[in-house]
């Protein structure tokens, strides 16, 4: 008898394991593909320490590998940091994937977003400064389609806020509240899908 699930091997990087997942029709053939968030060394927002870069892979349901996106060292890995939305945002019948990116993120074509030489991790492993981006990727190829500055920012009009500035805005100066994210897709005008990105708990 057929099993009530699908099973196929992943191209899991050493030290990583499968974590969150989402589905969408990436190529417009009417059949879902699956996007898997692969996590290595991760930290809660309240915990010090460096993490491994978040990795995303896309597969067809027969196990065919489509692409890999590596968010790089300037995106911290943990349960609250990366919210990824898989949805047909432009109405062409193919889903895109959208998420927060940073200098050194690598798209599914191997193209670097921003400046790969930058390292914004502080001595405690937190990332509290530097540019933050929102990127929409092509769901079929993983190629970056559009990258803009992430909104809401850590601090208005300042990519390098001080600890005191962060504390005044968020209630702490190390990102425990500031760097907890949520996201959704909503039909705000009743017709077109909009990407909604949220930032900050507890404040």
Question: Can you name each region flagged by the protein language model?
Answer:
Residues 1-203:
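Beta-propeller-forming repeat regions
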């Amino acid at each position: 008898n057929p099993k009530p699930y699908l099973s196929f091997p992943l191209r899991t990087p050493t030290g990583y394991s499968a974590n969150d997942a989402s589905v969408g029709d990436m190529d417009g053939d009417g059949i879902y593909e699956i996007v898997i968030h692969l996590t290595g060394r991760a930290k809660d927002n309240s915990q010090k320490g460096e993490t491994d870069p978040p990795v995303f892979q896309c597969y067809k349901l027969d196990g065919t590998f489509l692409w890999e996106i590596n968010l790089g060292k300037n995106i911290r890995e943990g349960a609250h940091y990366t919210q990824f939305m898989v949805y047909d945002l432009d109405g062409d019948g193919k889903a895109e994937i959208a998420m927060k990116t940073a200098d050194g993120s690598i798209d599914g074509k191997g193209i670097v977003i921003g400046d790969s030489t930058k390292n914004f991790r502080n001595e405690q492993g937190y990332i509290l400064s530097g540019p933050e981006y929102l990127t929409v990727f092509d769901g079929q190829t993983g190629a970056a389609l559009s990258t803009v500055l992430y909104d809401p920012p850590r601090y208005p009009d300042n990519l390098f806020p001080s600890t005191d500035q962060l504390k005044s805005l968020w209630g702490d100066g190390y990102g425990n509240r500031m760097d907890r994210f949520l996201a959704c897709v909503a039909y705000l005008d009743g017709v077109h899908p909009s990407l909604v990105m949220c930032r900050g708990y507890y404040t």
